[in-house]
């Protein structure tokens, strides 16, 4: 794909590593979760490594480029029920900083750390739903209640409105807008780390 971009456009200005899955499970679930955990490592971490490798040399030859890696706020802290997912995102954080250090003045690197983003299939990979307790804690019951309201027309009470202080979950569109903001900075300005959350979200971190 990188070669096709170069062939058609002559350069690769930006790479966004966005693929990811979230197979939440406790260590006691390891037998049932093993395949999902291995896939998580392949997609969440190795996928980023392969993506960077595909564009690195071209960006260096060009003299400039921008790599945007989608991580997670949960790459910052250990979370019960999220060991493998959290570990892959922590690895992405360190990988991003390593690339930035090695490529200063040639490749800009941004790590984007969202909290919950609706409208994706991320939750479909959860192995044990009870493992969500680690990222929600005491908010788990009210989270479930708000999830129902969020999906019910007429009951969202501002939860779905990005202009409301109660906005409950970032949409893919809103997240994309923040990524565009990062990319649109002058080449000499690099936003290396950004956390994107809804002002009314209920995640612990």
Residue ranges and their predicted role:
Residues 77-83, 167:
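Active-site loop immediately N-terminal to the catalytic Tyr-X3-Lys motif
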Residues 52, 88:
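Active-site helix of classical SDR
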Residues 72:
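Residue(s) in the substrate-gating loop at a strand-loop-helix junction
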């Amino acid at each position: 794909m990188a070669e096709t971009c170069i062939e058609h456009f002559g350069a690769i200005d930006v790479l966004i590593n966005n693929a990811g899955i979230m197979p939440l499970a406790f260590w006691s679930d390891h037998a049932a979760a093993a395949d999902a955990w291995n896939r998580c490592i392949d997609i969440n971490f190795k996928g980023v490594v392969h993506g960077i490798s595909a564009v690195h040399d071209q960006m260096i030859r060009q003299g400039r480029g921008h790599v945007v890696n989608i991580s997670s706020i949960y790459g910052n802290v250990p979370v019960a029920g999220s060991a493998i997912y959290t570990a892959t995102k922590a690895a992405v954080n360190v990988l991003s900083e390593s690339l930035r250090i090695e490529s200063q003045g040639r490749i800009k690197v941004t790590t984007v750390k969202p909290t919950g983003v609706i409208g994706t299939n991320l939750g479909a990979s959860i192995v044990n739903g009870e493992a969500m307790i680690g990222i929600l804690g005491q908010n788990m019951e009210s989270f479930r209640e708000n999830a129902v309201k969020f999906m019910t027309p007429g009951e969202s009470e501002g939860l779905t409105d990005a202009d409301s202080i109660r906005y409950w979950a970032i949409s893919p569109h809103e997240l994309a807008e923040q990524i565009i903001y990062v990319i649109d900075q002058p080449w000499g300005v690099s936003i290396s780390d950004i956390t994107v959350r809804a002002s009314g979200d209920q995640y612990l971190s």
